[in-house]
């Protein structure tokens, strides 16, 4: 039987910490090489794990003409084009008649479609509206996100495919001993992700230390730095972006993980934090299965409930230990070696689906 040919659209450069890029690498590395041939893009230096793999083809994007390079490759007879985005190349491809793009099935992997509309850019809204509703197959990482797809682009989700974590790489430290508990936020430093709440928490809990890790956008890092300086707080730091190895060490050096964002799917950072044995605090708005409320952490409904959860964990090392151990155990069902089998089964079914 011929192998299923898949073109993944996210770039896989080694220094790319975007969640979609990280997910694509883990999936491609685990697809059965006897049944799949994966093609992936990079700009400068691809993840070294992807090199010299018999079933993985790496393509370097040129510095100019990227849209046409990607568009031409999309027309090269793939069975599946995975992780459809809202780039001009995807827009052009999806506006071709099915006969022109056959046999490719365009697959939209949904994380939280409504999150895209937070961006006020008219161009991005135009591209989003002209791409995602035209895909052939829809997957979602949770039931909540599947409902979001139905509500926002009026499409039925064909598969629920969670994302995973490498539990062999993300492991707890031998012990956690700090005079002051370390509370960690990891994510894009924008208002929607909620890092500003850590400044409020730092003022409320002076016996804990708070770390904000991640790249800033929309000038929000500067806003937060100004707030910290004006407050005179000494128990909080804004550490900027970090590499994956650095992130792992930071998680091992922390005691509590917090992501006060209202709009997510399965936040990858909660999987990584839980795998390193951290209890996690999140909002319950998006019903993430990565945190079991009261067992591996807390799902809160309000900012005040976030603060109450923090207060409990900061004050009780035993509770942190129990929840952290439960979080690590919970991550077994999110290990990429297990989760990738679901992706492989879905891709085989998608490839066998007749083109409309």
Predicted regions and their residues:
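Short His-centered aromatic/hydrophobic patch
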Residues: 83-89, 110
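Conserved acidic donor-binding segment of nucleotide-sugar-dependent glycosyltransferases
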Residues: 293-304, 312-317
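Aromatic "clamp/platform" in nucleotide-sugar-dependent glycosyltransferases that forms part
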Residues: 262
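A conserved mid-protein helix/loop that constitutes part of the nucleotide-sugar donor-binding site
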Residues: 19-26, 181, 185-204
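Short alpha-helical donor nucleotide-sugar binding micro-motif in glycosyltransferases
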Residues: 241-242, 249-254
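Membrane-proximal helix-turn-helix segments that form the acceptor-binding/catalytic region
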Residues: 121-138
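Short hydrophobic beta-strand element within catalytic cores of glycosyltransferases
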Residues: 270, 279-282
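Glycosyltransferase donor-sugar binding loop
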Residues: 41-45, 165, 186, 209-223, ...
């Amino acid at each position: 039987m011929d192998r299923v040919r898949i073109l993944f659209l996210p770039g896989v450069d080694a220094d790319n910490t975007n969640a979609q890029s990280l997910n694509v690498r883990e999936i491609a590395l685990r697809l059965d090489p006897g049944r799949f041939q994966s093609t992936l893009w990079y700009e400068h230096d691809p993840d070294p794990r992807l090199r010299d793999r018999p079933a993985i083809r790496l393509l370097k994007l040129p510095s100019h003409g990227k849209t046409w390079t990607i568009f031409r490759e999309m027309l090269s007879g793939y069975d599946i084009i995975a992780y459809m985005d809202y780039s001009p190349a995807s827009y052009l491809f999806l506006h071709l008649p099915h006969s022109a793009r056959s046999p490719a099935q365009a697959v939209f992997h949904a994380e939280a479609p409504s999150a895209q509309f937070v961006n006020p850019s008219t161009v991005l809204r135009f591209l989003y509206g002209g791409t995602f509703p035209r895909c052939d197959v829809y997957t979602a990482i949770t039931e909540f996100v599947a409902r979001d797809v139905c509500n926002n682009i009026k499409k039925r989700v064909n598969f629920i495919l969670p994302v995973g974590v490498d539990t062999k790489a993300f492991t707890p430290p031998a012990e956690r001993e700090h005079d002051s508990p370390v509370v960690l936020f990891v994510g894009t430093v924008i208002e929607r992700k909620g890092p500003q709440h850590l400044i409020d928490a730092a003022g409320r809990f002076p016996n804990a230390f708070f770390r904000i890790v991640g790249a800033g956008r929309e000038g929000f890092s500067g806003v937060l730095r100004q707030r910290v300086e004006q407050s005179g707080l000494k128990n909080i730091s804004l550490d900027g972006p970090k590499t994956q190895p650095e992130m792992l060490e930071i998680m091992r050096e922390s005691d509590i993980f917090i992501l006060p964002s209202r709009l997510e799917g399965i936040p990858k950072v909660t999987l990584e934090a839980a795998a390193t044995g951290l209890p996690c605090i999140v909002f319950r708005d998006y019903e993430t299965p990565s945190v079991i409320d009261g067992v591996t952490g807390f799902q809160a409904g309000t900012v005040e409930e976030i603060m109450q959860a923090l207060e409990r964990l900061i004050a009780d090392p035993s509770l942190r230990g129990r929840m952290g151990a439960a979080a690590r155990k919970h991550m077994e069902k999110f290990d990429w070696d297990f989760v990738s089998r679901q992706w492989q089964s879905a891709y085989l079914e998608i490839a066998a689906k007749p083109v409309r």
